[in-house]
């Protein structure tokens, strides 16, 4: 049987991968957005694991709010990536400071 500790270890590994991806890759904006989403999903997994362990639905309801914010963040982030690519022809983070208007 898979216990609470297994879910928490998996969540910690996913969180660590997301943070490591942010620190390792600082140039590609799309990879940075994917790492942020990985971090949010790791946090959601921990909320679900604790919610199931404590038999309380508050954690699962909170996950829906986090998913809503993550979807909005992804949509805005991808819109910025598309605008950056159309204007500059690349999706490097260094090109963000040159966007004006």
From Swiss-Prot:
It catalyses: a quinone + NADH + 5 H(+)(in) = a quinol + NAD(+) + 4 H(+)(out). GO terms for molecular function: NADH:ubiquinone reductase (non-electrogenic) activity; quinone binding. One of its GO terms (cellular component) is NADH dehydrogenase complex. The chain crosses the membrane at residues 4-24, 30-50, 61-81. Its EC number is 7.1.1.-. HAMAP family: NDH1_NuoK. This is NADH-quinone oxidoreductase subunit K. It comes from Alkalilimnicola ehrlichii (strain ATCC BAA-1101 / DSM 17681 / MLHE-1). The gene is nuoK.
């Amino acid at each position: 049987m898979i216990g609470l500790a297994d879910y928490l270890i998996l969540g910690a590994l996913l969180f660590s991968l997301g943070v490591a991806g942010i620190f390792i890759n600082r140039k590609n904006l799309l990879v940075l957005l994917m790492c942020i989403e990985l971090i949010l999903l790791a946090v959601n997994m921990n909320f679900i694991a604790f919610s199931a362990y404590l038999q309380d639905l508050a954690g699962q309801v909170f996950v829906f709010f986090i998913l809503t914010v993550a979807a909005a963040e992804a949509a805005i982030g991808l819109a910025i990536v598309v605008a950056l690519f159309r204007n500059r022809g690349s999706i490097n983070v260094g090109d963000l400071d040159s966007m004006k208007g």
